[in-house]
């Protein structure tokens, strides 16, 4: 089957698209990649939150890609799942979710080995409200610095000394093999990842049964369960990719239960609400995600979300 993948043009996005293309190629499909420039890629001089305010849209990295799917220009899209809005438009399906890689956030620094080693008042670069909020909760003295751009751009700014450290997703650095300055991988109980972080989402049109069948082998059931929980919780809280909510679901080491970590934190005050919950393996993922959201709200998350477009 001839397949066309719609992808953003960043180094990481193309790595991900080529990875999926190679897996499809090994199944005998002919695959090409079409680069699509999204709203989030074009508006590089302002924050993600400001981009969302301008567009009135949570899908700042997906809208144009979905347009390519809708008009038949592409058969599938490869997304970083954390960038894909929870309210997927009606014509589209999340046809496959491959096995997740390291979902953790990491500290990257030239000179400092850990978050605790950063000096008083250190400058730390991040474009994420969620990371900024958790950073302020852990180290109120630190100055978060708005930091956009692709991985190479951020690493260059770090090397130039614009900041003392940056916060990134482990998955991107691992995939691009750019871990020279990776100093600390945060456990979810300390620094909770975004919903879907470390996972890819393969999006297709719902009515494209041939493409859905072609990508079905890529789907990983445990990963799909975990990210469904995370995305259900995020949807219940009214959060998009820039609301300061961290949610992570994983199988316990002995695979006997699901472990869930969640946090809602205020980007400026550092106030945070955290939960750690265990659930039976046979749980319903949607119901479990909704339960996590209810637990967060019951422990005081609503006021923290009120100013960020989340649940009231």
Please describe what each predicted stretch is.
Residues 1-45, 52-54, 62, 137-312:
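Small-molecule-sensing regulatory modules
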Residues 2, 73, 119-123:
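Short active-site oxyanion
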Residues 46-76:
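Short, structured active-site "lid" loops
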Residues 71-84, 197, 203-208:
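Ordered, amphipathic secondary-structure segments that act as subunit-interaction surfaces
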Residues 81-84, 88-142:
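A conserved helix-loop-strand patch within extracytoplasmic ligand-binding domains
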